[in-house]
Amino acid sequence: MASGGVGGTRELFRQFLNKECIWKKSPNSSPYLKIYVATTAISPVFKPDVGGRGRPGSAHAINVTALFMKPKGRRTCAAFYVNGLLLEACVPEVIFTKVVPGVLGLFLIYFGPFAEPRRPFPIPTEPAISAPQNVQLLNRMEMLDTSTHIALSDLGEAVAGREFTSVGKLVWWDGEAFFFYYLSMEYMMCCPTISEHTTLSRFITLLTQCDDRGCVPCHGRKIHANVAGGYTDPGSDGVSTTCLCTLSCAALEKELVPVTKNKSLLSLMFGPMTYQQVTHLRFTPSTRPARIQDIISGVTETGDRVDVRDGTWNLLKMSSLYSRCTLYECQILKRQCLRSY
């Protein structure tokens, strides 16, 4: 089990629970035994030593089960299973639980410092867990409704005094929220067959991705957790077509990238009269959110520049809550944005 001590494994585990998990209440809960489950992508900070003894195939996600019980005459005790193995049994100083509004049934839980129990307490076995896989955190309309639309005239004020981490070339993280470009609502009817979120980075991937289904940048295989479902099946493919991490390998590696697929989508960037002239996309990476015309443009066969037309794409700032959940879903986002506690 996790060892105690300030800065020790026990404290690191507590910080992991507070900083990288959002919870769902298990239907197996009772008035005497409360059970919550969480799943999160592999952490760059907390790396549990399960020695290969966890559930097979669970390498791309961490599944946590928390059991709270209150023995007669004693404080609330807690036990935690990680990928099927008992990792911690303790007495938390406090446990604060808050319901997240919405249909997903999510909970925020804060754990105070863990103490060793004065006397052993009976630890129930972990109940069987299952959940629908690939549960979507937000649909398109919810993304628009819960995010802040940043007008071009307000861009300077919105980014002033903030330090940003660039994710790929088209997403930015300020320590609390993600900033990214999203297709304007008026144009969503132009692409009804696209199931993915209509972020600019996703569009670029659809235009330039390679054919290797195992390519992580293009297809995101084995790096995503089923956060909204509360449990990641060990046999799942770990793919997400909605994650902000998605950007093709070609776009990540080069500043000038040929358009190889779905060329009709270019009309949503350059307009119906000029999109057919565009053969390549040119990136001008920015360390912070900027005008869309300043970070990406089209290039014709003769080398002429074509600007992205105004009004088609909106700069959004995702809410802090959903930014947090999005971060939990993805190994790449964690690796780039969550370096320590």
Swiss-Prot record:
Cited InterPro entries: Herpes_UL16/UL94
Source species, domain of life: Viruses
Pfam families, sorted: Herpes_UL16
Gene Ontology terms: cellular component: host cell cytoplasm; host cell nucleus; viral tegument
Localisation: Virion tegument; Host cytoplasm; Host nucleus
Key words of the record: Host cytoplasm, Host nucleus, Late protein, Virion, Virion tegument
Function: Plays a critical role in cytoplasmic virus egress. Participates in the final step of tegumentation and envelope acquisition within the host cytoplasm by directly interacting with the capsid. Upon virion binding to target cell, a signaling cascade is triggered to disrupt the interaction with the capsid, thereby preparing capsid uncoating.
Family: Belongs to the herpesviridae cytoplasmic envelopment protein 2 family.
Quaternary structure, from the entry: Interacts with cytoplasmic envelopment protein 3 and with the capsid.
Protein name: Cytoplasmic envelopment protein 2
Taxonomic source organism: Equine herpesvirus 2 (strain 86/87) (EHV-2)
Upper lineage: Viruses, Duplodnaviria, Heunggongvirae, Peploviricota, Herviviricetes
Gene symbol of the encoding locus: 33
